[in-house]
């Protein structure tokens, strides 16, 4: 059924229908309320569901109110009521405030990572408290660099150990029995039957808990179980000392050795 025009109240057929301001109009009836200028959907402005042109669109004006004592009192009372209501709502919602966060895959990944970090820290503290202060150093080094140890060990087995030819010694066999693993702790490999005597000296003595291959000229290579003498601490990550088996002196990583 065809609707009626909002202005002339006659039937509006689809060919001349204008649907605007929640009403139906003839194209000729859709004009400004003041100047009767024909309008369209691009240049009309609606006010109280009536069409107006841009020139005759009603302007909103503000009424000036005198700043009398009565008005000041009402203004102050309104502000006090707003503050009281705000404080009441604040006290009511105190401790209950929370923000809703979308459960995205990125947030799930971050939450899972935080749970894993917390679990690792808990087990680390538990192992330290169970082993005591003296037995926890080797495990700490083992936990700190397990990947570096497994990465460097095959490289050390492939390369023969360099021993100066000036002193006749028996060469250590390359293939050594694999170190057995109990939990997170690895037994050191069996040392060579005959080792070259290195000049002893004072200072701190450390024992290697991993194999290490020198990556620079000022570093030294050593094997698991070697004794490092004359050790001097450079910083938190590096030391300087002499490998007692080979007599080489240079820098070595601090997390590859433990104090004797």
UniProtKB/Swiss-Prot annotation:
Keywords: Acetylation, Actin-binding, Cytoplasm, Cytoskeleton, Ion transport, LIM domain, Metal-binding, Methylation, Phosphoprotein, Repeat, SH3 domain, Transport, Zinc. The modification Phosphothreonine is found at residues 68, 104. The modification N6-methyllysine is found at residue 75. InterPro entries: Lasp1_SH3 (IPR035630), LIM-SH3_domain_protein (IPR051759), Nebulin_repeat (IPR000900), SH3-like_dom_sf (IPR036028), SH3_domain (IPR001452), Znf_LIM (IPR001781). This is LIM and SH3 domain protein 1. The modification N6-succinyllysine is found at residue 112. GO terms for cellular component: cell cortex; cytoskeleton; focal adhesion. The modification N6-acetyllysine is found at residue 42. It is found in: Cytoplasm, Cell cortex; Cytoplasm, Cytoskeleton. It comes from Bos taurus. Disulfide bonds: none annotated. GO terms for molecular function: actin filament binding; metal ion binding. Plays an important role in the regulation of dynamic actin-based, cytoskeletal activities. Agonist-dependent changes in LASP1 phosphorylation may also serve to regulate actin-associated ion transport activities, not only in the parietal cell but also in certain other F-actin-rich secretory epithelial cell types.
């Amino acid at each position: 059924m065809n609707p009626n025009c909002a202005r002339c109240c006659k039937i509006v057929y689809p060919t001349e229908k204008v649907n605007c301001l929640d009403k139906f109009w003839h194209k000729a009836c859709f004009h400004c309320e003041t100047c009767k200028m024909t309008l369209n959907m691009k240049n009309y402005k609606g006010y109280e569901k009536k069409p107006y042109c841009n020139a005759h669109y009603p302007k909103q004006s503000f009424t000036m109110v005198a700043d009398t004592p009565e008005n000041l009192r009402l203004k102050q009372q309104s502000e006090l009521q707003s503050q009281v209501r705000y404080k009441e709502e604040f006290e009511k919602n105190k401790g209950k405030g929370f923000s809703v966060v979308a459960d995205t895959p990125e947030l799930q990944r971050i939450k899972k990572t935080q749970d894993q970090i917390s679990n690792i820290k808990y087990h680390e503290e538990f192992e330290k408290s169970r082993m005591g202060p003296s037995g926890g150093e080797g495990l700490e080094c083992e936990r700190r660099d397990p990947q570096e140890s497994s990465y460097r060990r095959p490289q050390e087995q492939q390369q023969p150990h360099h021993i100066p030819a000036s002193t006749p010694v028996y060469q250590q066999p390359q293939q050594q029995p694999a170190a057995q693993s109990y939990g997170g702790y690895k037994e050191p490999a069996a040392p060579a039957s005959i080792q070259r005597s290195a000049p002893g000296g004072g200072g701190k003595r450390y024992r290697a808990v991993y194999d290490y291959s020198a990556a620079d000229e000022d570093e030294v290579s050593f094997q698991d179980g070697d004794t490092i003498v004359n050790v001097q601490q450079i910083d938190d990550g590096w030391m300087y000392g002499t490998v007692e088996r080979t007599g080489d002196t240079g820098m070595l990583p601090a997390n590859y050795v433990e104090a004797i």
